[in-house]
């Protein structure tokens, strides 16, 4: 193999190595605690925040979506979120947990990101929204900046599938099929 081919091959493989996340199949996500902001709570039409940590994930089958606080990141896996809405999953057994990294937002847009989350919490009160002002989860889970990562967890909080980046339509279908399988157990 010539040096030129070897260099080209290493350039192709480098992004795969660089974007490696810390999610391992059949393991819990690496522990994370978010005290600054944290979980968005809606109670009697009033919003507040409480500390959140990954030890709270077991109990329901769930999608954990970690996104940068920017529209481009939200759009990367919007097709999955639409598929989840269409799947009509039972709220007593399933929950979407969205962690928004406002540390990775366009400067000055944090207030708009939180306002958008509040609107979504009103529309989907059964969903869980976490505001990570310091990027703690992204760092602990070694996720790409300006991106969107998806992890499917079983009811014991163990990772069954994960990807950092935009899902293909085939992967979206794979995730929905996996959710139905996990919910039937």
Predicted feature residues:
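Solvent-exposed loop/turn segments at secondary-structure junctions
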Residues: 70-72, 102-106, 134-137, 166-167
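Bacterial N-terminal signal peptides that target proteins for export
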Residues: 1-7
């Amino acid at each position: 193999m010539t040096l030129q081919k070897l260099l080209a091959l290493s350039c192709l493989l480098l992004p795969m190595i660089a974007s490696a996340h810390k999610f391992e199949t059949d393991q819990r996500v690496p522990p994370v605690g978010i005290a600054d902001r944290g979980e968005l709570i809606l109670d009697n039409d009033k919003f507040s925040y409480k500390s959140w940590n990954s030890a709270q994930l077991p109990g329901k089958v769930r999608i954990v979506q970690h996104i940068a606080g920017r529209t481009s990141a939200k759009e990367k896996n919007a097709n999955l979120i639409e598929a989840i809405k269409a799947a009509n999953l039972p709220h007593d057994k399933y929950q979407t947990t969205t962690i928004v990294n406002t540390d990775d937002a366009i400067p000055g847009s944090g207030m708009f990101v939180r306002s958008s989350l509040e609107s979504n919490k009103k529309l989907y009160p059964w969903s869980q929204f976490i505001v990570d002002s310091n990027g703690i989860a992204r760092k602990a889970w070694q996720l790409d900046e300006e991106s969107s990562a998806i992890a499917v967890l079983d009811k014991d909080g163990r990772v069954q599938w994960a990807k950092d980046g935009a899902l293909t339509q085939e992967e979206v279908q794979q995730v929905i099929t996996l959710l139905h399988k996990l919910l039937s157990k």
